[in-house]
């Protein structure tokens, strides 16, 4: 039985979640959700950055809604992603640090909280909710919710917890990796086949996103 989805927003390698209604109906807008790891509150030009230009993101901010007092659910990637997908706090999900865990120094006097390294399938995700409402969903980029990337070749991990099992119809690049082995093709990511040697990973993901749209 799936647990209920509670609304949540958190901003946190790069991932796109694309939710599109094949026949756009009134009240059912298409959705593009972009998550960026380790993004500081003033890293975007629209937030006051005077060094880096981010014109496209600035346009999103100007034409959409800005949450000026929002906080990420956790300071690291895996629990934040799990929280965004499910609307639940990392503590309730038992995902409290980035997979595969075990990052405390060996000499530490503290015991780490028991943490899962997969997103259990019984938790209902926003992708599953939107799929039930008629949306077709794609995931592109970093997933990092499918076990230990050292299990299997090229970040395979636990395939039974991939985006396809969590409400996404298309998965491009999502696997157990917490970061790509390289940012240039060939990427050595088994869910992202080589296309053009030397190609830059962010460019590839954007091309794939545009193709899906």
Question: Model features per residue range: what roles?
Answer:
Residues 1-7:
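Intrinsic disorder/low-complexity segments
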Residues 7-19:
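Bacterial N-terminal signal peptides
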Residues 4, 22-213:
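Formylglycine-dependent sulfatase
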